[in-house]
């Protein structure tokens, strides 16, 4: 009897690019020896739209609708970083009420982003039920966004010196109700997921990153805090009014996929604490700095004449960016979102460099998946939490 020879050739598998509704149009070229991963090469750029170059030909107000297309699941953070840069360049003060509204919107957006991470992450490792559960809270969140901003996604709500509109009547009470309801939902998630033995088998000890290794790779956000590094820009930089609230930085020591899950679950609870404190202490006053209009560099054009007074198309306000350099950053759900801005005494930025957290966090993926099983790739990739809109820009 002839015994068939065993093939020992390596196999190359293409994973992706997938539809943007999942992790995005990311392609992985995976080299396998049986079920063992030998090498992994991420292929990026399918969603590249030239966002940095577009910024050099737009005023800040004109560019605001573009930035919501970076991380389209956490658009408040991209808006915040866009208006914070000219505010610091021009030393523009933000009213206290506007700062509180910003914090509330940012933390609601953080919860929405973590929910949209949790559902697909659980679906990746074979648990379908949480994927449907998270849409209950997501719909309530988007109802709050729609009532305040007019849009469920791509809100275009932040403005230089404040926000576009004040909170509508009854919105604060609705937000209080959501906070109380959501805390019970987090308890349900922990009962359903955290103590599940099958879930623990899939994530515990998978994709371990040490603290020093995380720093050397430039990781940030939950990827960094899950490796034992207590670093949160809301505590470090104290931007907006975060230093007025009582909350704790969520972190873990082990650095595996389970730790990254626990950090994000804990962050959702802490975000609720921040929102509740902000709702209770929100002051009165203006929601925008009206003095900002003095900085408008738009020339008096024919659009302001009597014949055009009933035409809605008007030149957008523009602000001159002084000739200096500035780096601004915020703690986004996926890590440190930063902008390096160079002004040139013009209404257009001379350089607008984006520091996306997902792009930098993704660089460690090939190292994490080596010598792991093929099924572990989706677990590790899901625990990183990437959105290709901000990775490719």
Curated annotation (Swiss-Prot):
Keyword Lipid biosynthesis listed? The answer is no
Catalytic reactions of this protein: a plastoquinone + NADH + (n+1) H(+)(in) = a plastoquinol + NAD(+) + n H(+)(out); a plastoquinone + NADPH + (n+1) H(+)(in) = a plastoquinol + NADP(+) + n H(+)(out)
| Compartment list | Plastid, Chloroplast thylakoid membrane
Q: Which residues form the signal peptide?
A: none
- Class of this enzyme: translocase
**Example GO molecular function term?**
NAD binding
UniProt keywords (A-Z) are: Chloroplast, Membrane, NAD, NADP, Plastid, Plastoquinone, Quinone, Thylakoid, Translocase, Transport
Fetch the InterPro entries from UniProt.
Answer: NADH_Q_OxRdtase_suD (IPR001135), NADH_UbQ_OxRdtase_49kDa_CS (IPR014029), NDH1_su_D/H (IPR022885), NiFe-Hase_large (IPR029014)
Where is it found, in Gene Ontology cellular component terms? chloroplast thylakoid membrane
Task: Look up the EC number in the record and give it.
Answer: 7.1.1.-
Xref: Gene3D superfamilies: Cytochrome-c3 Hydrogenase, chain B
> Which PROSITE patterns does the UniProt record give?
COMPLEX1_49K
Disulfide bonds, paired cysteine numbers: none
Protein's GO biological process: photosynthesis, light reaction
Question: What membrane topology term does the record carry?
Answer: Peripheral membrane protein
Q: What is its main location?
A: plastid
Query: Does Nucleotide-binding count among this protein's keywords?
Result: no
> Its quaternary structure?
NDH is composed of at least 16 different subunits, 5 of which are encoded in the nucleus.
**What does the sequence similarity comment in the record state about its family?**
Belongs to the complex I 49 kDa subunit family.
* Function in brief: NDH shuttles electrons from NAD(P)H:plastoquinone, via FMN and iron-sulfur (Fe-S) centers, to quinones in the photosynthetic chain and possibly in a chloroplast respiratory chain. The immediate electron acceptor for the enzyme in this species is believed to be plastoquinone. Couples the redox reaction to proton translocation, and thus conserves the redox energy in a proton gradient.
Question: What's the protein name?
Answer: NAD(P)H-quinone oxidoreductase subunit H, chloroplastic
Organism from which the protein derives: Piper cenocladum (Ant piper)
Give the source lineage, highest ranks first. Eukaryota, Viridiplantae, Streptophyta, Embryophyta, Tracheophyta
């Amino acid at each position: 009897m002839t015994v068939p020879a065993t093939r020992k050739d390596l196999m190359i598998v293409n994973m992706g690019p997938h539809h943007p509704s999942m992790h995005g149009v990311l392609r992985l070229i995976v080299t396998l020896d049986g079920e063992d991963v030998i090498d992994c090469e991420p292929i990026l750029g399918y969603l590249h739209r030239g966002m940095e170059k577009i910024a050099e030909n737009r005023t800040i107000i004109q560019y605001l609708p573009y930035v919501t297309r970076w991380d389209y699941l956490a658009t408040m953070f991209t808006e915040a970083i866009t208006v914070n840069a000219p505010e610091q360049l021009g030393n523009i003060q933000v009213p206290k009420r506007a700062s509180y509204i910003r914090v509330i919107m940012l933390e609601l957006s953080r919860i929405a982003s973590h929910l949209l991470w949790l559902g697909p992450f659980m679906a990746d490792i074979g648990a379908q039920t949480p994927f449907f559960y998270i849409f209950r809270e997501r719909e309530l969140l988007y109802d709050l966004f729609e009532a305040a901003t007019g849009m469920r996604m791509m809100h275009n709500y932040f403005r230089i010196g404040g926000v576009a509109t004040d909170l509508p009547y009854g919105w604060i009470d609705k937000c209080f109700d959501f906070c109380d309801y959501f805390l019970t939902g987090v308890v349900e998630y922990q009962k359903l997921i955290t103590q599940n033995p099958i879930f623990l088998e899939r994530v515990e000890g998978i994709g371990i990153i040490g603290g020093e290794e995380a720093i050397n790779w430039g990781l940030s956000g939950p990827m960094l805090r899950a490796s034992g590094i207590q670093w949160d820009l809301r505590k470090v930089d104290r931007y907006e009014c975060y230093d007025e609230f009582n909350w704790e930085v969520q972190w873990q020591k082990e650095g595996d996929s389970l730790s990254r899950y626990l950090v994000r679950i804990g962050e959702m609870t802490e975000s609720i604490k921040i929102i509740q404190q902000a709702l209770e202490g929100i002051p009165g006053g203006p929601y925008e700095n009206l003095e900002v209009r003095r900085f408008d560099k738009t020339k008096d054009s024919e659009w302001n004449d009597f014949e055009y007074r009933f035409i809605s198309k008007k030149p957008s306000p523009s602000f001159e960016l002084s000739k200096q350099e500035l780096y601004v950053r915020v703690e986004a759900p996926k890590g440190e979102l930063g902008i390096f801005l160079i002004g040139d005494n013009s209404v257009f930025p001379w350089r607008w460099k984006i520091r996306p957290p997902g792009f930098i966090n993704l660089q460690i993926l090939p190292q994490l998946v080596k010598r792991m099983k093929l099924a572990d790739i989706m677990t590790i990739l899901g625990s990183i939490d990437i959105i290709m809109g901000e990775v490719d820009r």
